[in-house]
Amino acid sequence: MDAMRRMRILKQHLKTDRLLGVSAVPVGDAAATATMVQAEPQPGREAFSTASLPVMKRDQKIQALTQMDEQEVRGCTACVLCENRIQTVFGEGNPDASIMFIGEGPGQSEDEQGRPFVGRSGDLLDKQIQAMGFKRSDVYIANVVKCRPPNNRTPLADEVDACSGYLRRQIEIIRPKVIITLGGPAAKLVLGTAEGITRIRGTWHEYTAVNPPVPVMPTFHPAYLLRQYTKENRAKVWSDLQAAMERLGLGPRG
């Protein structure tokens, strides 16, 4: 990992720590006596633990998310995606959400409106959320990258790296009990796997960039389901969503 990326990740960790009221963080081997370092940039240090971070109240979460969006994401120029965007798409929803949906990146409609999952894919996702017994405002919806890739292509590795800290901090602040990734690219990027969506959907995985790790259920993207709207595919997605509900102790729905 190059020095610039290490420094960016470090700064992103430190910004989150300050928002959460932490002035010092333990680094190094957890089995050894923890070495405390002040929350100032220290090049080369990446082994931060979030286990001791305090749970934020709702208004604190809103403030932290709003500050990240307005002061960092909207003006971000960390990768080439900033060059052609209309606006950034930070994410939206309940800061206390038990379920967080994560897609790959904004499309044209999202870029124009500044909101995740609008248009036909968003309509289908809204219906899926309602079928689970929630409203859109009950969950949190975000993307791996916050700017639209040209022609809706899959984000490149350096683009994902540039945005990875934003997503990690969103997850740290919201602390969802379950993450549902939407589509193969999102699952690969969140989980760091090369496996295709047809092989990993329907089974539980973990997002380990935060502590404690968050259970992840990959499923098909709504756009794919619209293109391949078969009874079999709909049943697979519904099975994945039911698994998430059961994980939350909600039990299956009809």
Region roles according to the model:
Residues 1-9:
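Charged, compositionally biased N-terminal leader segments and the immediate start
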Residues 8, 12, 16-18, 23-254:
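A polyanion-binding, active-site-adjacent surface
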